[in-house]
Amino acid sequence: MIQVRNLKKTFIKDGNRIEVLRGLDLKIEDGTSLAILGVSGAGKTTFVHILGTLDHPTSGEVLFNGLDVFNWPEKKLASFRNRTIGFVFQFHNLLPEFSSLENTMMPALISGMPRRNALERAETLLHDVGLGDRMTHKPSELSGGEQQRVAVARALVMEPEILLADEPTGNLDTETGRKIEDILLELNRQKGITLIVVTHNQSLAGRMSRSIGLRDGEIVTCA
C-alpha cells in the first residue's frame, strides 16, 4: 500500500517560490488501478515522479507498506526503485542501438540478474505484449505502438509491484492507444500490479478502478 500524507513540493525559479504540490493526502491499496487527471501544469507528472522515487518531496510523507523510503541512502533507494517500480512514459526512451529483446532485458542486467534469467523473462514478456516475432528488431524498425509495447515489457522485466505510466498513449493514434490500455489493464487484473496512470483520456480513466483529479497542485476530485 502507498500512503501519501500532506505531500508538498516546491521549486525555486528565478528567485520565485513555486508550489507545485500543496498538501496531498491519498491512500492507494495494493492492486488498485488509479487514473490521475488534470490539465497541464496541475502537478500530475511531479506527483508521479515522487511516487516513483525519481524526485523527493519538499515535505510530507510517502510510505510504501509503512516505510518512508525517502529517508534511505540514495543507493538503497535506487535498488528499491529498480526492484519495486516500473515506468512507462509518453516517449518510449528505448536505446536505439539495441533490439527489442536487449532493451527489455536492460533493467534486469543492470540489477545483476544472470543473463540467462533476464533473457527468459524478456522473451516471455515480449510474447505477452504480442511482439514475439519482433524481438530482434531495433526501435527504428518498429511502429510507435510496437515501441511502446517494448517499453511496457521493459517496465515489467523486474516483476514490479507498482507500474507508473505517464501519458503512455499520448503519442499514439486512438486504435493503437487502446491496445496499450488493454495491455496495462490486463496486467493489473491478472498479476495484481498496482497501476497508476497519468492521462488526459477520460475514456481510459473510466476503465480504471479509481481516479483523482489535480488542479493547482491539489486533489479536487476523488472517485
Swiss-Prot record:
The keyword Phosphoprotein does not apply. It is a peripheral membrane protein. SUPFAM superfamilies: P-loop containing nucleoside triphosphate hydrolases. One of its GO terms (biological process) is protein localization to outer membrane. Its main location: membrane. It comes from the Bacteria. GO terms for cellular component: plasma membrane. Keywords: ATP-binding, Cell inner membrane, Cell membrane, Membrane, Nucleotide-binding, Translocase, Transport. The complex is composed of two ATP-binding proteins (LolD) and two transmembrane proteins (LolC and LolE). Belongs to the ABC transporter superfamily. Lipoprotein translocase (TC 3.A.1.125) family. This is Lipoprotein-releasing system ATP-binding protein LolD. It comes from Syntrophus aciditrophicus (strain SB).
